[in-house]
Structures are given as structure tokens and as C-alpha cells.
């Protein structure tokens, strides 16, 4: 709808001669050349309508973004249509008429996606404009604006910001936070020459925004408060009536250096993405928890040997690492940048018995059974998992005044994996998880036989399991259902109706010769340490926030006593942190940390006699 308004009182006070246009479509922009130069031509309009914007100027992939026809169309609803209850939708507002000030009621129109306030007499823009968080297009050209509010930098949905022909002498550094901005119009402003020189370079908008963002943290207007400590969530008291061993586990995706780019994380300053800066905070995060066992994902090969292993050895750890399978075919210079999974353990509490690497592409090839989807979808992904079989040292065991049953050693299997990332490949993630659990079960079974271990209570799994992983799967996924419930049906929706059934039975806990069933099981009784929404998200980026990292432990031998809770959401909100990494948060993942209790066999008393074998 469009109407010429002389007295528009719904905005709180009279605004003289406003033109209000309400568009029925996604309102965006007129052509880019008009924005840059202040001129408009039919030729440029036609040419720019053919452009398809798929990436922001920082390179972050976004939803397809098509500039609409700049000749915006609108209709006026008739009285009959209004009387019949016809609903209107408008996402664009245009105000004209040499307006000098704006009503505060304007900031309540949070549904707006485009706001045209050019060719007026505005000298300032209120900070409340940031309340229009859905704006993708903002035209403030040809006014008398002398300064911009810092809050403008919080309008991270903006794709077009037009400031041509104003009286701006400086730009707030906060504008650098507009990482999705594709076009910035600055012509006709008395800005400093160094700013204009940067702006006029090829790809000048991106360069200028990067400059502003990189220098933002050095200004006094930015809060540099560290995030508050994460709270400890107590879940259960340890069992003091029997011998038990207490130990702690950390799971942490540290964000490999080669993935930490402005193309993926345009909201983070480049200096805060730099590995030399981030690695200090990452190590501080790891050491602050002082976990007995540490599982890391996205560890670069070179950084494992030259940084993580060296640093953690000084604090009493030993480690095991394997890179992704692609490292096999690379030169030595390229191989050192391949990421993988690592496990570290405190040598004062554990000794290494065995170590294993599980390559999913090799397992897929060996178990394809002629399945094309197994070969074409699973085998082509080179994710890996690692596992270490650890023996608890005697100093770890708390006897609690009870008699330990006769036992040669107490073992623990620690597994760590990183599944494929792409949301479109839920089938691959599920198959990778099945393959990993199948191999983990083989490790447990072989270790039990070769080391002649048996559960004194007759349980099939004498070796408890702790599984840490970046599963790249949400809690309602088939992957988590498979782990939590013991199995999943071969017709699960995450398989995408692709024919895996011929090869899935190879990963069933009963093996390919087991009982015929459409349900694929793993044979463990696993439980997540973080249940009931204890963590609202483990991965926190601008585009995605959700739980994809997990610590699972096997029952009944293991219990969780407590976990490290989430980062205070108020701190994130109050500091307008829309995604990580951040200068104070070195990865796009939050670490998980849990204290576990391992129940040990003990001898009970019957008529004053010790009877071994109780769990």
C-alpha cells in the first residue's frame, strides 16, 4: 500500500508530508552503481537485476539473495478489501519530505526489512535504530548526518547501507561488525583521505570493514570483560559404600587453523582468528579444567607435535594422535596441516595398553557389499576416530574401606571421533557412527580375550567405555538415537531412503551372521553425560547454534557425578556476541567437561566370609 500522509499520528507525533510505501515482496535495493556514485541509469538497473548474490563481501556463504526490481510496486487496499478482512503485508517503509527527526514509534516496526530515509534533513540517527534487527537495506543518503551511532554495528543482517552525500567525518569502528554487508555507500562525505583511499580500492567495502573490525577492540567504547566462569552442575554423589575410581574427561573441538578464516567467520577480527592468538586461550581452557583425559578434535598435525603434546607433557600428560586419511596421499609439507583427533591422559593416573586408529573410508570400502551409496557417499569422506585402552594405576582407586575383589588390572577404553560435517549427509554420519562403534566393540572383545579379562559379575563388557565426539548431529538425530537407545532401524529417515541395508548388518553387534533384524545395534549401554538440555549449544556461530558435541559413557560400570555448565547467556547477549570465535572465545565450540565414577569389583561379607564378585 502507498499513501501520502500529511498528519501521521500513529508514529507518536505529527510528521509532515511523509510518503509511506509498503512493499509486498522482499525489499532490498536499487542498483549498486547508483549507490556508489549517486547516479541511476536504466542500463545499470537491468544489468544488476541479473546478478545472483550468494556470498557476502567477506565471503561467508549465505542464503540466495536476489536484488529485486528497483521499480518497487505497491497497491492501495480498497475500502471493500479492508472491510472483507483482507490482510496486508508490508516489509518496506519509505519516509520523505525533508523530515528533521524521527518518531520513537518507528523503532517498534521490527518486522521491516528495508527502510528508505534518503533526501531528508536528518542530522542524527538515534541508537534505537538497532532495534530494527531484520533490516537488510538501509538508505540514509542525502541527509545532514554528522555522526553515526555505534549501535549501527549490531544490525548484522544488513546487506546494503547507503550513507552517500552526508556530513560524516568519521565512521564508528563498530561498522566493521556488519560482516554480511555487500554494499556500503560513502560518496559525498568529508571522510579522512586514508579511509576513502581504502574504500576506493578494489573490493574496498570488504577491506574497509575488515579494517574497522580489526581496530574495534582497541577503542575505549568496547567492553573487554572476560566471560564469567562456567558454573559446575552437580548431578550425583559418589558411592561411598564401595571402592570406586573417580576421573574427569574433557571433549573439545579446538577449530583447526586452516578452517578459521574470515570467509567462514566474518564477524571475528582477523587477529583473533590467528592461530598464534587463539592457541594461548585454547591451552588455557584445557589446563583450567585439568581433566584426567582430554579428547580433542580438529587438531592440526604440526600443532599436535609442536604445541599440544609439548605443552601437555609439561603438565603430566601423554598423548595419541591420528590425522584424517587424506594425509596418506599428501606430501610432507602438506601433511602437517591435516587435522585429526587426539587423546591425552595423565600418566600419574593411567598407563597406555593399546592405541587404535579407525579410518572410516577404509571400513566403508571393506564393508560395501556392492553398495553404490556406501562407495560413493561414505567411502569418499576421510573422517577418523581414535581409541586408547588405558589401565588405571593403583593410586587412582579409592577403596572406601571396602575389600577389592581379586583382579589383575582395571582397564578403560577411551574413544574419540569427528564425524562428517555436512547437514545434507545425515546418512554418512550415521553409518560412520555405526562403523566406529562396531570397531570399538571389536577392540573391547579382543582385549577381553587376549588379556583374559572377565567381569566378575558376569557382564559382557568388562571394559567400560567413554566416547567423546564431535558428531555434527543434533540430539534428535539418528546418530544420537543410535548411541542412546542401543540401536536404530535400517529404515530410519536419516538414511534418506538410500540402500544401505546390505552392508549395515556388518556393523550389527551380532555380526553379519547374527539374527536377522532391521534394527542395527551396537551392544553397549550408553548414556550422555549432558542430558536434559544441560547445554543449550556446544557449537555457537552466527548461522548455527546447537548441540553437536557429546560425552557418552557405558553403564552400569560408569556414572556421571557432575558436568561443567554452559557459558552465561547473559554475557553473550549483553556483549552482542552473535557467534564464535570471538577475541575472548578461541573456538566455535564450547568444551565439555564431566567427572565420572568407575565402580570397581569388591568382596562382600556373608556370615563373616569374603565373597568375591560383587559389582
Where does each model-flagged region fall?
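Metal-dependent phosphoester-hydrolase catalytic domains
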Residues: 173, 231-238, 302, 349-350, ...
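Residue-level marker for buried hydrophobic side chains located in beta-strands
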Residues: 186, 249-250, 467
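Intrinsically disordered, low-complexity regions enriched in proline, serine, glycine
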Residues: 103-104, 125-127, 149-150, 170-173, ...
Amino acid at each position: 500500500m502507498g499513501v501520502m500522509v500529511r498528519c501521521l499520528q500513529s508514529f507518536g507525533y505529527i510528521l509532515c508530508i511523509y510518503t509511506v510505501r509498503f512493499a509486498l515482496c522482499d525489499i532490498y535495493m536499487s542498483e549498486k552503481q547508483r549507490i556508489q556514485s549517486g547516479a541511476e541509469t536504466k542500463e545499470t538497473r537491468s544489468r544488476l537485476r541479473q546478478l545472483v548474490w550468494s556470498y557476502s563481501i567477506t565471503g561467508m556463504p549465505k542464503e540466495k539473495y536476489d536484488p529485486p526490481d528497483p521499480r518497487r510496486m505497491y497497491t492501495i487496499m480498497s475500502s471493500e478489501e479492508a472491510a472483507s478482512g483482507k490482510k496486508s503485508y508490508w516489509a518496506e517503509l519509505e519516509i520523505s519530505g525533508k523530515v528533521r527527526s524521527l518518531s520513537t514509534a518507528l523503532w517498534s516496526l521490527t518486522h521491516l526489512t528495508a527502510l528508505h530515509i534518503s533526501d531528508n534533513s536528518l542530522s542524527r540517527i538515534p541508537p534505537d535504530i538497532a532495534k530494527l534487527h531484520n533490516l537488510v537495506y538501509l538508505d540514509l543518503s542525502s541527509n545532514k548526518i554528522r555522526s553515526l551511532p555505534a549501535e549501527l554495528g549490531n544490525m548484522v543482517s544488513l546487506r546494503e547501507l547507503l550513507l552517500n552525500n552526508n556530513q560524516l567525518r568519521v565512521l564508528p569502528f563498530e561498522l566493521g561488525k556488519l560482516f554480511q554487508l555487500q554494499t556500503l555507500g560513502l560518496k559525498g562525505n568529508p571522510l579522512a583521505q586514508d579511509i576513502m583511499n581504502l574504500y576506493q580500492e578494489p573490493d574496498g567495502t570488504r577491506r574497509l570493514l575488515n579494517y574497522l573490525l580489526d581496530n574495534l577492540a582497541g577503542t575505549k567504547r568496547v567492553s573487554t570483560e572476560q566471560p564469567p566462569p562456567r558454573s559446575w552442575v552437580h548431578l550425583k554423589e559418589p558411592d561411598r559404600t564401595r571402592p570406586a575410581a573417580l576421573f574427569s574427561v574433557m571433549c573439545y573441538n579446538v577449530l583447526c587453523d586452516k578452517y578459521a578464516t574470515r570467509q567462514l567467520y566474518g564477524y571475528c577480527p582477523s587477529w583473533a582468528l590467528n592461530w598464534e592468538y587463539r592457541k594461548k586461550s585454547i591451552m588455557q581452557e584445557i589446563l583450567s579444567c585439568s581433566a584426567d583425559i582430554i579428547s580433542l578434535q580438529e587438531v592440526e598435525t604440526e600443532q599436535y607435535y609442536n604445541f599440544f603434546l609439548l605443552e601437555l607433557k609439561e603438565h603430566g600428560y601423554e598423548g595419541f594422535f591420528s590425522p584424517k586419511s587424506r594425509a596418506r596421499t599428501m606430501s610432507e609439507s602438506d601433511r602437517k596441516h591435516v587435522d585429526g583427533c587426539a587423546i591425552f591422559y595423565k600418566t600419574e593416573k593411567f598407563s597406555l595398553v593399546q592405541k587404535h586408529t579407525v579410518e572410516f573410508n577404509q571400513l566403508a570400502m571393506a564393508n560395501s557389499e556392492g553398495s553404490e551409496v556406501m562407495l560413493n557417499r561414505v567411502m569418499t569422506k576421510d573422517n577418523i576416530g581414535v581409541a586408547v585402552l588405558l589401565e588405571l594405576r593403583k593410586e587412582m582407586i579409592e577403596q572406601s574401606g571396602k575389600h577389592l575383589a581379586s583382579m589383575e588390572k582395571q582397564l578403560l577404553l577411551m574413544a574419540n571421533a569427528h564425524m562428517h560435517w555436512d547437514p545434507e549427509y545425515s546418512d554418512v554420519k550415521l553409518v560412520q557412527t555405526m562403523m566406529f562403534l562396531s570397531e570399538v566393540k571389536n577392540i573391547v572383545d579382543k582385549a577381553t580375550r587376549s588379556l583374559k579379562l572377565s567381569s566378575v559379575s558376569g557382564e559382557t563388557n568388562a571394559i567400560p567405555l567413554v566416547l567423546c565426539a564431535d558428531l555434527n548431529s543434533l540430539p534428535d538425530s539418528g546418530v544420537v538415537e543410535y548411541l542412546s537407545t542401543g540401536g536404530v532401524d535400517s529404515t530410519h529417515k536419516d538414511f534418506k531412503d538410500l540402500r544401505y541395508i546390505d552392508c549395515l548388518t556388518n556393523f550389527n553387534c551380532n555380526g553379519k551372521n547374527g539374527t536377522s533384524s532391521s534394527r542395527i545395534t551396537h551392544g553397549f549401554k550408553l548414556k550422555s553425560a549432558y542430558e536434559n538440555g544441560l547445554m543449550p549449544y556446544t557449537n555457537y556461530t552466527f548461522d548455527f547454534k546447537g548441540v553437536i558435541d557429546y560425552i557418552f559413557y557405558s553403564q552400569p560400570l560408569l556414572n556421571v557425578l557432575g558436568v561443567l555448565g554452559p557459558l552465561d547467556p547473559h554475557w553473550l547477549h549483553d556483549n552482542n556476541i552473535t557467534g564464535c570465535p570471538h577475541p575472548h572465545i578461541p573456538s566455535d565450540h564450547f568444551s565439555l567437561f564431566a567427572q565420572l565414577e568407575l565402580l570397581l569389583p569388591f568382596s562382600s561379607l556373608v556370615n563373616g566370609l569374603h565373597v568375591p564378585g560383587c559389582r
